[in-house]
Structure formats: structure tokens, C-alpha cells
Amino acid sequence: MSEKKVPGVGEYDGPAGGWGALRAVAGAISKQMAVVRETSAMRRMNQPNGFDCPGCAWPDPKHTSSFEFCENGAKAVSWEATSKRATPEFFAKHTVSELWGWHDHQLEDEGRLTHPMAYDKASDTYVEVSWEEAMQRVAVGLRALPDPNMAEFYTSGRASNEAAFLYQLFAREYGTNNFPDCSNMCHEATSVGLPQSIGVGKGTVSLEDFDHCDAIFSIGHNPGTNHPRMLGTLREVAQRGAPIIVFNPLPERGLERFVSPQSPAEMLTGKATELATTYYKVKVGGDVAVLKGMMKYVLAADAADRAAGGPGKLDDAFIAQHTVGLDALVDDLNATSWETIERKSGLSRADIEAAASVYVNAKRVIVCYGMGITQHKHGTENVHHIANLLLMRGNIGREGAGICPLRGHSNVQGDRTVGITEKPNDDLLNGIRQRFGFEPPSAHGHDAVEAVKAIRDGRSKVLICLGGNLAVAMSDPEATFAAMAKLDMAVHIATKLNRSHLILARESIILPCLGRTELDLQAGGFQSVTVEDSMSMVHASQGRLKPAAQTLRSEPAIVAMMAMATLPNTKVDWQAMIDDYDLIRDGIEAVFPIFKDFNKRVREPGGFRLYIAACERIWATPDKRAHFLIGKGLDEDGPEVKDALTLTTIRSHDQYNTTIYGMDDRYRGITGRRDVIFIHPSDLAARGLQHGDRIDVETVPSQANGSDPRAVRGYTAVAYEIARGSVAMYYPEGNSLVALENYDERSGTPAYKSVPVKIVAAQQQAA
């Protein structure tokens, strides 16, 4: 980084974790809530008979420690269990017009919502309404639609299995499969791509597999911020000598070195564990090129070994017995030149072959990946090629090996498992029909992008959101905000105020709900819910804290209340299921047989793992084989534009998805600001710019992102050791540069990490 002093921009020399993490936890506690309440909450997080962290989906170990949480988990709990309240009195003091000018951090930092609220146009404020009136308004709005498919039912990955199951049941009895979901914006390429490759849209590894792997490849992921508890697992792998190979555009401290806050020796000495054996800074969007290069090396090493009289490096028996499509993949790889691979990836052939050599010489390999793989115009193809690489050497269905998509929100995978999908299969529809006695719709509905398009075009008029902040999470806020302002009705089930609540429909309603940390008392007693983590483990979660307000309702209860108000002739006994959540789980088990003995097994410490056929080398594909798949090649984004850079959006260390806990990004040296863009010093110099200059970021016309001009202005350039030709901005600020039409056509995932841009000097240069 340049020696030029820029306000709020510096360097962080410490490791991930360590005292920096503990200070951050203490700061989060002191800002949000009483220490006694906070300590009680933390001791219950991710523990048997406690509550599941409302943050990420990293699994819990079988034998938990006394404090089984991380820095960002502590922030998530502090944020939810805050002592601050957004009461009706708060809303009376602040018009929606005023609140629109607040920063997103300020909006949520006002604290927990306490009462149902409805927008009053005359005063330009949200005003308190009773639960009965709120439900009646929802029912009137839904019944007024001439077609159920004019309603959109959005789901956040924070929702429990029980809430999500009731939600999809309500929407389907109402008559639609319109289920835009937060997973559409993150790992949908996984949910679409992996079933085509191996027959299941989930990862194949368990936490125990990390104890047996011979190597880990981490691609497009930053666990230090997004899954901090994963660092403890990587630390153990590194300490036993297994190589960890990283491909990522930015250097991330959480992949470089780590001091475990649970290790007294490390905390006292400051001695960090080095994590990444080798760190390759691949160009943004260069992942397919890297994977193809690695597979070319595997083929070459296989041929060389056979020529020398060896057995080869491909797993011939596995390939012959379990797969199809290798010949076509080999032809595709042979037709791909190393010159193209090097140009697209930004890495040398020698570097790629060195990484591939580690892969070839390791018997059991795990590949972990995040949204750096999925949020591309070619995200599904990225996923296919990771599967291809693993299939070449039989690294699926083997102990210590497999594919590990690292999902974000704590139950985003579970929501999909229990029916949140716009494309229901026959098994799901038959299960609903047999258990609940109504005819569910079969026509495919809308994903997130299609939902926004339908709202924009006037084809959808009602939006109900089970959590989340859809307007801010979605690409192209200019188009998304304008679309949502056309709605007849918007209903938000939420714990805190966010910007989506301020985009006013003709009728706008906020329904406050319990958080994961809070006691849920129903007629049948205190209730627990369940969640599914990234490795298909299902376990119970029971809040332990007093609710933020006595007026709150649980998410399952709110969904059931809406259903009962809207569907006078319902076939479902909603009230019985709300009185006793065991009955919801009985319904889940009836519709989804993989939940056999659900209520019994979920009460066992640690819960249970759902059946993943690919783990047993059983492939749920049409021909019962795993598939080697090829894509469009490395030039699918169209011709390269001179002087264009490729933008990726990233999270700061002080945020989780659209929730911004604070304005710092400790591991990248940013303090008190978010208006920065990370760029390689050479890319700055080539444009006559310097570290600290104020710049404008403009899109360039492209096949993927369209020709409409888009820009963000007045950002500060931060010289950073990011891959050449790549730049990074924080999400959601960078969403303004992503066209609504810029998404992976196979999965519908917005291409938040595939945006061609140019940077130019802003008119004013004061940093």
C-alpha cells in the first residue's frame, strides 16, 4: 500500500482471531446490550438445548466447547438481542421521508421492532395497528388479486424449517409457486449445478471429513469474515500438515494466519497458525480458467504416469462405474489453450500446474467454495468444473474428500429442503396433496430476479417477505426500488427496521417477530425450531432470552395467522401446529421422508444428518450416473474491453449480508468508512491515478451487463494487492453497477462478481 495518508485507510498487521476478535466482541456487547444478558446468550449459542447462531451456516462439532461462537456470531447475537427498541413512539417522531435519508446501519441500529405497524400516508409515518387489523389488511390485499400468481412470497435464510414449511404451505394453498428466496442471490448456482453433476444440490462432506483429508482447496471464499468458526477447522488441518491451497482475488487474513481465541497458549504468545500453504490471486472471473488448467494437468500427469508404467492418475474404476461424459470433457480441455487460460486467470501455467500437482498427489481432497464461485454470469459452469475436478480422481463419496459449498445464512439450505422452491417436483406436490388434502399448483413460479421483473412489469402486485432486506440485497437498486414502489401491498416480517420497509407500496405493513435468541411460548408450552447447516446436519434451536416485547409473535405463528385470515376454507389445521411445533415437524416428515423420526432424532444432542445419496456414490440423476459437464468456454462474457477492469462486490468484516454492524473492515485496514474501492497499484498507475484519489466507477457496455450507463461517484481508491485487472467494492453499495439482467441464465443468480467497469478521476480530489 502507498505511504500516502488517507483518512480511515491503513493496514492491519495482526492475525485473524486473537485479541482483535475479542476486543470486537466486547465492543459489540457494550454498544448493544447489558453484559449479563449478553453473557447468558453467548453461553447458550450453538450448544445442545440452546439456540443456533443467527449468522452463518457452519456446522457445530459433535463435542462443543463452553464458548462455541465466533466474533461475527457474537455480533449477530448482540445485534438481535440488543436492548434498543424501535417503538411506535420512534416511528411517530420520524417520517418515512426522513428515515430514507438515514444510512442502512442507522436504520437497524435503532433496535428491535415491538409492534405491528402500517404506513399512514397522511402523516408519512408508520403507525401502530393491532395484530387483528394487520392480519385483516393482509387478507384483504391477497384476496383482492385476480390471480394468486400476482403475489410473491420471499424468504430469508434466517427463517427456521418450521416457519419456512408453513410459509410454503400457505402460499401453495393460496395458489402460487412464486418463491423468490435469498438463496437465489447467493448459492443458486450450487442448487442448480450440483444436481446436474452429482444428483444433489448440497455438499457431500461432513465436519469429520476435515479430520481425514490430505488437502483442501479453497476457492472464492473469505471464511475469516463469512464463516469465522471455519478457521478453527482449517487451523487443525494446517497443524497436522495437510496443504491448504487458496484461489482468491484478494489476500484475506482469515486464509493467511489465525490465532485461536480458545487457545491460551496462542493468545499469550501471539503465535499464529499459518493457514494457506500457497495463495494464488486469481483474476475475478478467472475460476473456470484455473479449473480447466488444473484438469489439463491431471490429464497430462495421468498420461505421463501410464507411459512410465504406472496406473495413471485418473480413478479409472470410479469413472467407469459411476460417471459419464469424460471423453467430451477431455476434448474440451484439449481445445483450450494455455495462453487463454493464463490470460483469463491472471496466473501462470507454472502456478496452476503446481496447485494441480498437490491435487494429483493427495488421495483425499476437499474443495470448499463460496460466492466467489457462484455469483457470476457463468456461476453454474464454475460449480460444474469443481465437480469435474473432483470426479476425475474419485473424490466424491470417499472419507476425507468431497465438495463443500459454504452457504451463508444459518438456514438457507434448510429452507430449500422443506419446500421453498419455485420449481416443485412431483414428490413435493404429492406429499402436500396426501398430507394436507388440497391440490397444490404445479406450474413453476418466480425466483428473485423474475419476481422483481414481474413487479416492475405490473404482473405481480403483492410482496410478502419472511425476513430479509430484498430491495437492498437485489442487484440494480434503481430498477428494484422503482419496481417495489409500484406494489399494491408489501408485508414485511422482521426483527428490525431496514430500507425495504421504506419503499412504500399502496399498503405497507411491518410485522415484528421473535428472534432466534428468544423464548417462544405457545399454548403447548415453550417451543423449539430446527435449522439445517451447510453440511446437512439438522438440529434444534430454542431461544432462552426474554422477548424484546410481549407484543411479538413467532415467525411460524405469524405465517399461520396470515393463512387463517386469508384462507377461510383452508384444509390445514394451522392453530394446532402453532400450539405445538412437533405437529409442524410431523408434517415435514410426512411430505419429506428423509426426515423420518424427525421429532425423535432432533432431540438427540447435535441432531442428525440428512441422507445425501452422493455420499454413498448413489447418483440421483436421470441415468443414475455422475456427469462430467462442459460449458461455453472461456470467452462466454463476450469480447474483452480495452482498459476495463472486472468488479467484484465483497463484504466488510463488520457486516453480514445486508446487515451492517459497523463501519470498519478491520482485516483490510479500513476504519469508519465504506466509500472505497480496492485496486492494484499498477492498475492505478496505468490510469494516472494514485492511492487516495477520489474516483468515479462507471460500467462499460458488455454482453452481460448491458449498455445502460451506470456509475457510482466520489469513491476513494485504495491501493491493494488484489489480482491485476480486478477491483472490489463493498456490497450492497456496488449493486448499483449490476444490471438486473446480468445474471447466470442457468440458475438466475445475479452476477455481483462479474461487472466490467472503468475508473476515472472524480472532479474533486479531496479524500
Go through each PLM region and give its residues:
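Low-complexity, highly charged intrinsically disordered N-terminal segments
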Residues: 79-125, 135
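Short Cys/His-rich Zn2+-coordinating modules
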Residues: 30-41
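Cofactor-pocket helix-loop regions in the catalytic cores of large enzyme subunits
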Residues: 2-24, 111-410, 418, 432-610, ...
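Short cysteine-rich clusters marking metal-coordination/redox-active sites
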Residues: 50-56
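Short, solvent-exposed secondary-structure boundary/capping segments
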Residues: 721-734
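Long, low-complexity intrinsically disordered regions
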Residues: 746-767
